[in-house]
Amino acid sequence: MIKESMHKRAGQVFSLVWLVTVLVTSSHAHTEPRLGMDKLQGTSSIELMPSEAEVRAALAQQPKLAATKARLAGQGQEALLRRLGPYETHLALGQQHRRPRMSVESVSIDRSLGLERSLRLWDKLAVDQAWADAIESRANAERALSELSLRQQFLEHWRGFLRELLAEEAARRTAASSEALWIQAQARRRLGELAQVDEQTAKAEQLQAFADLIEARSRKLAKIEQLKKRYPVLGFDRSLPTTPAQWFGLLNAVQKLPTDIDRAEHQYIEQSPLVLLAKLQGLELGLQAKRIDLDQRPDPSLGAFVSQERSGAEHVIGVQVSIPIAGQQRAVAAKLAVHQLEESFSLNEELILEMRSDLRARLSSWQQGLLALKPRWEAYALHDEAAVRSLRGFALGERSLTEVLQARRVADLQYIQALSQSLELLLLKTGLELDLGLRWQ
């Protein structure tokens, strides 16, 4: 009886020690902070987006930039050609043999030299000079648009990198949760056959999560290698914020997006290289139409010539003016240019309308997304607390493994959704700042 009592007391002590161990382990199994609404505002020292100097250095090495410079140099020559115009001086040399029929005179030789040049009328000259100025302005607008396009392309590449970071963080989170659950199941395996089955299931979950984490990290490393080839000067040692305070610090850092949509719309349209380029192209078409209309009155040509006739016995000096007779094709070309100009105006209006609506939609998404972010993080905090309590209940035998897995998966899903929405808002804000001229200029 004494031996049986000692065995019973030892079993009770072991159960008590095991219970205390499980409770302590479960309280530390998940270290994510409990969140309240007072913790959702804050600052962050994490900077996910490269600095202006880093972006400038990265883009300076892009082949597309060199191609843009070459194209702009060609447009400078195009402007010079427009200033000069297709006006050339023509040299005419002639020689003829004169053989009289009814005369005793011998054969004589006539020689002539003439110069002729088309004259550009003064109103056409003014249009050509304005057209050349428009070409140079268009070249500057194309350069600005090309630089903006490079920055937007860079943002898309960086977006891919950050999404791989997000995938890795999601896999890390799942792996950590699976590890904590397996530890709890391992501590309960002595309770019987069902507890051992739970331990095996938890171990399988942990191995699967670990494999997913390895795959996520390999995809991230592959993306880094891809971007290093294109942007070798950039550093990729970055990690995502994991708390709402850090995310709100990033979203509220440095630049404040305009809250007045009408003001933001005006700023967007006024400084957009795309709109400026469309306006300058319309200006060019207008000048082209005006030039073609003026060409219905052809340019005259002025020439001078000297000649020697009868083997030098006679000298002739003369001046001549020639004016082409305009044909029907000039009037048709003028009407065609007017139609092209009207089409350009309509396309410009459509472009501006599309840009205005796109900006309003993105600004609205930013404002509404920012409002939705706080309750999303709060929802995650509640689900996370429920998952932790469910794990404690599992340690006490109050919850099944299936219930714990379900609670943890819901909490992890809420965490990933909050993290993903935070990242997408940061990318949305960065794109808006880029388009409004507030970033990477």
Name each region found by the language model:
Residues 58, 115, 161, 227, ...:
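Hydrophobic/aromatic residues within transmembrane alpha-helices of membrane transport systems
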Residues 56-66, 73-88, 102, 113-131, ...:
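A glycine-/polar-enriched beta->alpha junction
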Residues 2, 7-8, 146-271, 362-365, ...:
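Periplasmic alpha-helical coiled-coil/stalk elements that build and connect Gram-negative outer-membrane
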Residues 29-95, 119, 127, 193-196, ...:
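Bacterial Sec-pathway N-terminal export signals of envelope proteins
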